[in-house]
Amino acid sequence: IECEVCMKPGDRCNGSMMT
C-alpha cells in the first residue's frame, strides 16, 4: 500500500513513520 499523504511527522508512509 502506497502512502497518499505523509507530510506531517508521525504519518504512516509504507509502514514507516515519515519524519
UniProtKB/Swiss-Prot annotation:
Glycosylation sites: 14
Chief localization: secreted
GO molecular function term, any single one: phospholipase A2 inhibitor activity
Keyword terms of this UniProt record: Disulfide bond, Glycoprotein, Phospholipase A2 inhibitor, Secreted
Tissue-wise expression: Expressed by the liver.
Localization annotation: Secreted
Family designation: Belongs to the CNF-like-inhibitor family.
Function: Inhibits the enzymatic activity of phospholipase A2 (PLA2).
Protein name: Phospholipase A2 inhibitor gamma subunit B1
Organism from which the protein derives: Crotalus durissus terrificus
